[in-house]
Amino acid sequence: MKAILLNQIGGPESLVYEDAPKPVPKDDQVLVRVFAAAITPTEFAWYPTFHKPDGSARPFPVILGHEFSGVVAAIGPACTGVQVGDAVFGLNDWFIDGAQADYCLTVPANVAPKPASLEHAQAAVVPISALTAWQALVDRAHLSEGQRVLIHGAAGGVGSFAVQLAHHKKAHVIATASAANAEFVKGLGADQVIDYRTTPFEAVVRDVDVVLDTVGGDTRDRSWGVLRKGGQLVTIAADAERFSLPRVRDAFFIVEPNRAQLIEVSRLIDAGVMKPVVGAVFPMERFREAYEQKPARGKNVLQIGEV
């Protein structure tokens, strides 16, 4: 099969497009014929990209791209809940090879039926971003009707789903984005959009119940001051310098695969409640452009196979 391989520690410049062995599913694994995989540039900084769960180094080459859409090509004898030929979307375990290849391995608990209303390229940007938004706002912050939520990076992959989900939960949604994306973010359901380039959000926002930070650094540090007493900040951006601070560690989380949540997200998408935001779609062999051309909205996607 063809795959995009990371042969050494580095960034997109360390990727190559080469032949690789087609994976074989174990008893509890699903082999997916990948049709689209989303680009997540932060994978180059993820711990699991270069380490095994025991802390030892992962051998190279490594395949990135841990959210995908495709069709089940084979299943192990112990698999239940999926059948060969099913159109699915989902995630891989962080510590195994990803989906920037013709085929990838996962487990039944990490995939769900692809939303019927979406093409594979659209579905591929959903799993990580939508589950991150869900687990941040619903599982951790317990966002409820009437609460005020501030979402940083609202035009991005996670932020765009978070705005839509918070709007669906009937919260009052305040978002930060560029002026160029203000109307777009309002269209997703934001009640107020702050141009982060011209207006310090802390100058116009106070007493929010929840902050979802997808940016980190100074943006996160300034966000503590706009929370009401007892409010909650949730962040997916943690830098080493600040991660030593207890409140940053407590606010940080990493998304986990969740089939039930994927099914609910799929239902909401097919009902028109939420929609994915795709930056640009690139053929697999143009993978370097997909990484280097940062989208103004959503995530870029690799088109890997023809349906």
Question: Where do the model's predicted regions map?
Answer:
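Short helix-loop-beta connector
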Residues: 67, 116-119, 142-148
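A structural motif shared across PLP-dependent enzymes of the aminotransferase-like
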Residues: 95-108
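Mid-domain Rossmann-like dinucleotide-binding core that forms the NAD(H)/NADP(H) cofactor-binding site
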Residues: 84, 124-195
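Rossmann-fold dehydrogenase core element
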Residues: 231-280
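C-terminal hydrophobic helical "lid"/dimerization subdomain
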Residues: 33, 262-307
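Glycine-rich cofactor phosphate-binding loops and adjacent beta1-alpha1 units
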Residues: 174, 186-251
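Glycine-rich beta-strand-centered segment in the early N-terminal region that forms part
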Residues: 21-39, 51-95
